[in-house]
Amino acid sequence: MLKIFENTLKQVLKAHVRPNKPAVELDPMQKYHKVGEYEVGADDHTPGNEKYILTVYQNDKGILYQALSPQKTDRLAATYIRRFDERLGRFRAFQNRKNGMRYRVLEYLDQFMKQVKEQIRSGNNSINIGVLTDTHYKDTDSVDFYGHNGLIHVREFSYLENFGLLHLKAHLGDWIDGSDPGLISESELIKLRNSFKSARTPFAMIKGNHDENDKFDEHHDLKASFPEDEFEKIMWPTMYNQAALRYVSRYHGVAYFDKDDLRVIFLNTSDVPYIIDENGKKKYDTKLTLAIREDQVEELIEILEGSSGKRIIIMSHGNPINRKGGNAMKYNGRSLHELLVAFNQNQKGRMHSHNVPPEFTLSNDFDFTNVENAKVIAYFCGHRHVEDQFRINGIQYIFFNCSALMGPNHVLTTKYNKNWNRQIDDITEFAGYVVNVDLVKGKIQIFGYGAASSKRVYDI
């Protein structure tokens, strides 16, 4: 792993936004190119600074590999392995052969979580939430954009559970890029699901606009590559099969989690009907159609009506409104925001939709007059591949940066990520968060690792 993990750790943890960094310095074991065995240790930045045998070898295609085996073991199989990449002119980061995680990343996350623990209050009404979003897993070995790194990011994010700090973790959607053939994307979702699910920490699997695989359909002008409810069938049974998550039904992706006086509600902003024409093509491109529909809204209303005594955070992939208060979804974003405002004001009424297709019409009744001591305090979302925040009608809208690698030389890379100059095998390759919601202090603290602000603080 690049030596930047050590040299910039304090800077990343303390600086609000890390500027473009200079040319990176490679790790000491990069110098071993000659086939053979070498004794390496702390001076070579080995795992845990322990003594290892470094074996350098070539495969039958002439590709150079390095493998690390502990000196104190009799096993022949290496624990860590990496290969030389001609595109980079160096070896990649060492990965654990069993789980694919990189030990230098885990060492960095050890320090990150130590810093987080020192800055949060433990006890009642201090809730910690791990947040990851927009991993855009894709079946390509990219060194500067979406690719296999998306799965690695999910596995390394799940490592945060080992510290016993998280009460909940959530992936805010766009698990996959949705640009691979259907069967491949389905297998990607299964790998991601298995890497994210947990017996230790309650988790939310939120759907993103890329998770219907419509990007592949768009580029190939073919029939729908996913059958109806493919994401839902792969991901949601696992999510709903948790005692810690409560729900009205298992059909729409709506669920909620309670801890002390905090309630976290999960929504699906890719709530789009599966309608195909006589040629097998979809009527609605889910990638371009962020929306929420009547049945899902009905479940949200039912949950809100039973939320007395709760401070509430909503989580979804897309943001319903923009910083000017306008609709940020294709359908019903502004209506969703107005419903949350009505809840905070203990109102009673009926929702209406104007100039929307029949599939997206809202006509839900709501009555929040009997709800006591409750408020929606924040709305967490991804989708935009930036960090941002705005407060409208007393609700904090907070955006989280994408975990997916966005190199500076790609058209799709947002300005925010270009400023990070993100690089493979560097701390800027990924991004993730731990959010502390302290209802006693009235603060939301957001701690970021990788291509993320180290700390953001907002009033509740």
Report the location of each language-model feature.
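Acidic, His/Gly-rich catalytic cores of divalent-metal-dependent hydrolytic chemistry
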Residues: E429, N436-I460
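N-terminal active-site segment of His-dependent metallophosphoesterases
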Residues: Q95-E186
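Active-site neighborhood of phospho(di)ester-bond hydrolases with catalytic His/Asp-centered motifs
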Residues: V131-T133, K169-D174, F203-N209, I313-H317, ...
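Loop/turn elements at helix/coil->beta-strand transitions in domains of secreted/extracellular proteins
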Residues: N125-N128, G164-K169, S198-A204, D260-R263, ...
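Extended active-site neighborhood of metal-dependent phosphoesterases/phosphodiesterases
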Residues: Y108-V116, D180-E299, E338, Q345, ...
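Solvent-exposed loop/turn segments at secondary-structure junctions
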Residues: T135-K138, W175-G178, N209-D214, T269-P273, ...
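Active-site-proximal segments of metal-dependent phosphoesterases and phosphodiesterases across multiple
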Residues: S185-E186, D277-V297, E305-I377
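Glycine-rich, flexible loop motifs
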Residues: N7-Y80
